[in-house]
Amino acid sequence: SLMALMLWSVAHSWRFPHFFPTRFSLTNWSTPLQQLLEPLSVSALAALLSCLLAIILVVGCFENEQNLARARIASISQRSLWIIYLPLLIPQISFLFGIQVVLVVFHLEGTWPALVWVHLVFVLPYVFLTLANAYRSYDQRYSYVGMTLCGGPLRTFFRIKLIMLAKPILFSMAVGFGVSIAQYLPTLYVGAGRFATITTETVSIASGSDRRVMAVYALTQLLLALTGFLTAIVLPAAVFRKRKAMQN
């Protein structure tokens, strides 16, 4: 299917029964690119904001979990994890209408805070799942040595722990970024049709008859989602280029 999208995006004419397009052209990309600037910017901004909020909440959750474990205080986090996973288990359409009604009552429908919040509902579980193993496997002895050498727990957290966990954090954010990009129904319901994202535009174009334009929109959506993963790969390699162990 990916190969078909790539061929359609550069096809000038492709008629039955030809196996490949008879003519190729890049004109399919020239016109839609101007129309894609707003959907791309809206999608990227909403995804970045929801990912940043998600990573802050998830890191705070794990830190609280570890603090309770060190203090040997009984935690209900394991028993309440199902709350985080609910958006993954329940069909979106079954509770999005309720969220929309609440936002309408409080006059928040079609606003940026509402859009970011509803994306956060779906981004948070994926960020939590992808970061859980790496964060819980972190060797606390690094932090103990850091507190001995360079100062208090807050300074050690930012200068040692977060740096050592930078790559898994970036990858979990990349997953969340891709999840946010893919949201269609939440954007349509909560955004009240006021936010044109790359996904809503792609679905709208897909209902038309021009497969060439549809392929351009679909590939653009794919490339935007891949940007997050490329950043998660390239950024640690560039920042820690003199520290080979930090790149793995």
Please report, for each region that a protein language model flagged, where it lies by residue.
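Short helix-to-coil transition segments within interhelical loops
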Residues: 68-72, 138-166
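Residues in the helix-turn-helix
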Residues: 94, 155-156, 197
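Glycine-rich helix-loop "coupling/hinge" segments at transmembrane-helix boundaries
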Residues: 17-22, 184-212, 244-248
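Membrane-helix interface/capping residues of multi-pass secondary transporters
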Residues: 112, 142, 151-153, 184, ...
